[in-house]
Amino acid sequence: MRKDIQIFLLRAFRVVIILSLVSCSTQNEASIEFERLSSIAKSINIVRDDFGVPHIYGKTDADAVFGLLYAQAEDDFPRIERNYIWAIGRLAEIEGEQAIYSDLRARLFMTTEEAKMAYASAPEWLQLLCQSFADGLNYYLASNPEVTPKLITHFEPWMPMFFFEGSIGGDIEQIPLAGIESFYGADENFVVKDTSKTAVSDFIEPKGSNGFAISGEHTASGNSMLLINPHTSFYFRGEVHVVSEEGLNAYGAVTWGQFFVYQGFNENTGWMHTSTRLDFMDEFIEDIDKI
């Protein structure tokens, strides 16, 4: 009996030792990672003006992206996280069963494996920016332990491959969820409308943003002007100024969680995005015979 107790205690002691070693190893890895991120952060300066707009300065473009994502997270981490939860197809995990078809649509568009492959095959400069995207957000979470993510506790560099279209209602959202539900039997009476054959009498006022390019011939200053009126929700994008010593100097609007200025300007040019009827993605309607 005593021998059995000794064996049991010895095994229990070994388990405790193993768990302690694993815990120490995990803590050590986390400490090393935080030191790495802290070292990068020293190369970045974030200054907020009287309106709260962040002006981000980095030595390299990658440093600037790190600072940009950190500043975005300071302003609205929940929106960043939700954008990626939606993009990678995990919305139902926080919003319930009603989001299943949204998740299915996202995963039909791209799987995690495909996103990882896209990242692995990307040019080195883009990989660096994607890594800085993840580093900036992970540094924010590590530096602000009081922030509790709903789902994503660690961001990965392949995640931006899911979320590179920064408009509202763009890309995969043009495919109606009702059609996906119908395909899987939730609503067998759903019929996809062929909008290309809409009669003039049935004309529906188009929705979307307004963008105007005005020649200097028509302005008082003689300078060309861009006017963009993005039809988004009020807080869909944040205002930023991002600068690097490699030549980046852009001011404008950034969709939460993305690392490029979506609408803005620099010393020499300006850019805007608005809605058009360009065919930038493919949709197919197939007749499926039930067996």
Language-model-derived ranges and their functions:
Residues 31-237, 245-247, 252-260, 278:
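Substrate-recognition/specificity elements adjacent to catalytic centers across diverse enzyme folds
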Residues 236-239, 282-284:
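A short secondary-structure junction signal
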Residues 250, 255-291:
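Compact, glycine/acidic-enriched structural inserts
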Residues 22-23:
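C-terminal motif of bacterial Sec signal peptides marking the signal peptidase cleavage site
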Residues 4-18:
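Sec-dependent signal peptide recognition
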